[in-house]
Amino acid sequence: MKVGVIGCGYWGAKHVRVLSSLPDVSLVVAIDAQSERIEPLRRMYPSALCVTSLDEVIDLIDAAIIATPPRSHAPLAKRLLQAGKHVMVEKPMTASTAEARELVALADDNGLTLATGHTFEHNAVVKHLRDMVTGGELGKIYYIDTARLNLGLYQPDVNVVWDLAPHDISIINMVLGSTPTAVSAWGASHAGTPFEDVAYLRLEYGNIGATANIHVSWLDPSKVRRVTVVGSQRMAVYDDMLDEGRLRIYDKGVQGAPLDGTVPMSYRYGGIVSPHIPMTEPLAEVDRDFVESAISGRRPAVDGQRGLAVVEVLEAAAESMATGRTVQLTPATDAVLA
């Protein structure tokens, strides 16, 4: 299969590297209008075809990965799907739910693969955490807290929610096996840019009685990548900044015991376990799954419907930040998150 990578900046260049190692990929085509990005790739991957325009190779390629700025995702994906190409789009899949729905319909109508680059859904730790939740090892899930913070990198065309929150929304949807029924959000810009650089989102998963809180920031002194899951039996913390023991399971909890109008609490302080989880490179899993899906015709692990589910939350968060109101959503069917 001949696969193009459109947009060869920091992340697109990584796709070129991974695709160059996949046995099912006979040709990697690197596409970027900026020649200064193309030249280093030409030297590093001499077997790759490096060009500055999609027009030069659209008839040559069988599939493409789009790693350009978010607002260009939908027009590029639509053009490729209309040309009969399989497509994977980096996060966020599109800049609106209307665009996302159009791409999903276009792929379905033409029997083409549409995948979304939610890398963490291919992460071994996140998969392990999902399996623990699904298996009931944490008990009933009360809430999930996530923090994705750093000093930068400010983006030129989207705010911090559209830049960082797709990771956390996709993780939470995957771990809970559900999508939100309501979204509220607050954000602000502190550095004189037109886009919010700090934001807080609250997601209500009303169909399972859980909530999630997301904190994203480009304006924080420390780099934080953390997911906390609190259940009735145990609690789990996934800290992606740790070199070892990224997932820790805490045998801790509380239990109320009403007596004479008071509620004395019983606290449980158990041990901490960090399970051994064999790690693979998530991006390699992303690209391998996309290529294999395009060849076989099977549904990709993270398809367009899952990308649409994330965009719906992002758009609801934008509406909530603008209006100050909670936005109601219809949860996705089980088939979307299977």
What are these regions (language model features)?
Residues 166-251, 276, 280-299, 334-338:
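Contiguous beta-strand/loop segments that form the cofactor/metal-binding neighborhood of enzyme cores
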Residues 63-66, 289-338:
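C-terminal helix-rich "cap/oligomerization" subdomain common to oxidoreductases
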Residues 63-70, 74-121:
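Beta-strand-loop-alpha-helix segment that lines the small-molecule cofactor/substrate pocket
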Residues 113, 120-194, 198-200, 247, ...:
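Predominantly a Rossmann-like dinucleotide-binding segment in NAD(P)-dependent oxidoreductases
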Residues 1-45:
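N-terminal Rossmann-like dinucleotide-binding module
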Residues 157-161, 273-281:
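A short glycine-threonine-serine/GTX helix/turn-capping micro-motif
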Residues 48-60:
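Short acidic low-complexity segments
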